[in-house]
Amino acid sequence: MKSIIILGDGMADEPIEALGGKTPMQYADTPYMDKLAEMGVTGRMKTVADGFHPGSEVANMAVLGYDLPTVYEGRGVLEAASIGYDLKPGEMAMRCNLICVEGDILKNHSSGHITTEEADELIRFLNEKLGSDHIHFYTGVSYRHLLIVKGGDKRLDCTPPHDVPLHPFRPLMIKPEVPEAQETADLLNNLILQSQEILKDHPVNLRRIAAGKDPANSIWPWSPGYRPAMQTMQEMYGFKQGSVISAVDLIRGIGVYAGLEVIDVEGATGLYDTNYEGKAHAALEALKTNDFVYLHVEACDEAGHEGDVDLKIRTIENLDKRAIGILFEELQKWDEPVAIAVLPDHPTPCAIRTHTNTPVPFLIYKPGQEPDSVTRFDEFSVLEGKYGILEKDEFIKELL
């Protein structure tokens, strides 16, 4: 049976007083997710392995069944793969955010969601001023970019900037985990401080300030790693061909290493205005020839990081009606059965504006299966589901 996973990044949350003690998933109007839960089986998944930070790379790799202690090499290496960079022996890749600092405060992790066009101009300028034979910046999407350090030591204690909005940034700068990594930590911290000097008066930032927008006035490198040794999903599970649909470099990079076809969708932004319908139709087209599709939607996570409850509810409802609804209605017409799974990768609670490692709700619908008693899809309804809590590769094996 063919299968599709629809992943609402950061969709899970905690009860919110302003919503009458409900979570955004409970409060949102989600007829299609509820219908799939009613027709299918539900439970929770532990997507963050013990000892790991609840990052999207950790959680999404877990959803796909990868053994994190064996294959995890950080976010940077995955994003390098997504832009076609072939990471070589001796090279260290890092995610490099363009962030906004205000005085000594890390104001936000995204520079007010700077456009890719603006960011590309800044990344090229950073290469001119700070690049060398050992240091190179590569443009990604919006605020999410790549830093390659030749000869870097990955044994570093780095803080994801989305975890610490409105905190003083200096105590959060990079620290070595072992004495041998001190040189790399010093190099990267100097790059952070130098970037602030050269970016503060750049024309892109002056224009943004004049328009009332946050400037991208600092880099913030984090999540270092080397080239990972990952099996493809075809090798792990035996299907012939799969695909991934996402606007996020990280997820696309996971797809590259997982052996999945990376599908581009016009208007897929990784933000609230993404092309939900286009992604759904692309998934349907892919399912005609592929055995497996991983459809990832980032919008809920971004709303959680902004701490915007109303926006998070709206993104959940958009995912339900403008993507899952299209898929559900069309797949009901197909002669060939398709299994459908829906879940978040991790919670991104609006109250704290960052990820947690709380197990997430999931549903699996397979035509002809015996459903459990759950009739709504949210963090608490699935506590009555068939599966309890699944770990490691248990979820993906149940689906496939």
Over which residues does each language-model region extend?
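Feature captures the catalytic ectodomains and active-site-proximal regions of enzymes
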Residues: 1-400
